[in-house]
Amino acid sequence: MSSARRPSKLLSEKQSDKLAQIIQNFFLKAAHVIFHFRVAFPSVVLQPDDSYGAMGDTFSQSKYNNRWFNLDLGNYEIPRTELSLWRNKDILSLPPLVLETFLDLRGLSSNQTLMLDDVIVKTSKKSEIVLERWLIEFDLSTFDNEVMEFPSIYKKIIILFRSLYLLAGLLPSYRLRDKLVKSKSKNSAIHVSCRILDGSKPITSKGRIGLSKKLLSEEEHTSSKKLQPVLTPIGALRVSVSYRTNCNFQVSDTEEALSSQFMLDHLPSVRTNYDSDGNSLTSPMDYLQNRVSSASIHWSDQSPRRRSSTRSVQLFKVGSINSSSSPPPGATQSNQSVSSFSTSKPIPVTLNKTNSSASLVPILRQNKDSLPKSIGSMVQNQMQETGHQVSSNSRRFSSSFGSRFRTVSSRNNSLDGQLVVANQPFSTPSNNPILHNFRSRNKSPSVSSTELGPSSSIYMDDDLDSFMKMLDSKPDLRFPSNSPSVYEDPLANFKTFQKSNDFLALEQQQHGSPTSNQIMIHSQSQTSQSQVFKRTVFSDRSRRGSVSSNYSPSSQALRPGASAPMVTPSVTYGKFHASSGSPSNSSLAQYLRHNSSPPASATAVATVHNSLRRLTSSSQRTNTNSTNSSTRPVNPELLKLKSFNEDVFESDDDEHDEHSPRSTDTKSRNTGPSSGHAEDDEDDLLFAMSDMTLAKNNQEF
């Protein structure tokens, strides 16, 4: 069971953490399974005495179910204070966990009597009767260094818990608990409860009836079982139980019990039965067994020839499977006298009878030869002392799965189900290098992994653990000073970009500024003359700085890389306050001023005015008949167009040189009474026609 040779590799830190979680949750889950079968829900709240604490309805309801080892027992959990030793201590120093199941007698009144199989049990000055004790321990002396696969260990523990779940529901104490829960009396005077004890400390029986004390005259009143241990690289996980075989307790009134006992003692037909040795038979089972055994002895005396082949048959077979087999040919008469298949009387079992039950841990750790736990094991020990070999018969009924250990061992298939290992070499924990490596890491989990969510497993804390280690390994972040040196280079690049894209930045500001009632109307005319007209209007309005008309032509961003700035043929119809100029006009005026010198811009504006006047005169000649024949009322916007035209051309004439021939010509035309009025009328007519065309296009758009 233990490997003394040096392992091929040691446990890593991550593997050590997982193994520590498995071992810790093994203790907690085993306690949960036992309490699940022993404590009724709901149960009576017990008041613990000074020595021990009793647990009744002290289970708390958790938010999630503990699904460790593929076993879901509901959302009830044991209080943390009861399992504090096994939650926060070091894995290698975990004490054995003892769970004690007892029958509480504190509810018995003076007129009530406790009876066991129609026999009165003396419970004076006793408050409890111990029914069973479970021992859960982590044995460091037994290990297997070659078992390094933790999923395999986890699956073996799953099988162990299934066996524990089945065994806990088959023991007599569970049947007693089930009977008391299903009884009609809600306020029962007795009930089953559990407590948790530290197995490293002695267990006394002061003020209660211990597990080793007999309540009837039966020879063997206790039994024990051990489950298959699970080996790990640093130790073995073990579960064992010692229990009372008879738990048929019941409560009756004292007067009824005494009257029934008095009537049985004074009936003439009732007589005391004795066996062949003169011992009184108090129970019907003893009387029936005595009759069967006496009949078999009488038959063997009448047939001396068949004495060698005749054997007695008990009513209930007690012992191992080996006891029902035929005797070995080399067995002597003395061996037959002590074997279970050649005697008709029960074999006495020597037990350590003391006034107070000793600690369970030393008893279970004693040598199996010194303290037999069942009849089958005692018979095997007696045969070994006389030189009889029973290994061949025991192997006859061995498991078909073979030995699960690496050492030579034999399995005893007796009734108590003990695991008897012969010729087993034990190694001390000092010979285990993996254990030393595990101890050097000083594993002491402060938070149990059972506190995780419903999908709790051994891989749940890996992310959090790695994150905390990453935080510890990384140095503290140091922020630089408040000097703006970090931002100097990006700011310089941004300024360079802004200079090269000045017009684009202005257009972004134009789109970002809010405008009211802005409607974009695309003109169908794409001639160069209309473009020149719009450019002239933009330049004039930018120079004035204020807008007196509701017409606000807008511009569109120029494409970078073009040889000449092209303006999209569109007119913006909007309303602006007189105090604030049009954003589009101002931006375009700034662009024109930026790209042209003042003398050149003045000359260009004069040229635009001349071409505009030629266009106006030609349009007036072609549309004279249509305008004269039109009887429609004058559009109200005509006055606005007139004022707009006058303001534009007057402001332009003021800015030009007074000595220029074109300017003097314009002044003479404006000062002439007849010619000035005629030209103004032509201009008004042209703008009125443009306004009607724009309104029509606006409706179509």
From Swiss-Prot:
GO terms for cellular component: Atg1/ULK1 kinase complex; cytosol; phagophore assembly site. Residues 647-656 have a biased composition (Acidic residues). Pfam families: ATG13 (PF10033). Residues 657-668 have a biased composition (Basic and acidic residues). It is found in: Cytoplasm; Preautophagosomal structure. Residues 319-343, 521-563, 577-701 are annotated as: Disordered. PANTHER family: AUTOPHAGY-RELATED PROTEIN 13, PTHR13430. Belongs to the ATG13 family. Fungi subfamily. This is Autophagy-related protein 13. The lineage of its organism: Eukaryota, Fungi, Dikarya, Ascomycota, Saccharomycotina.
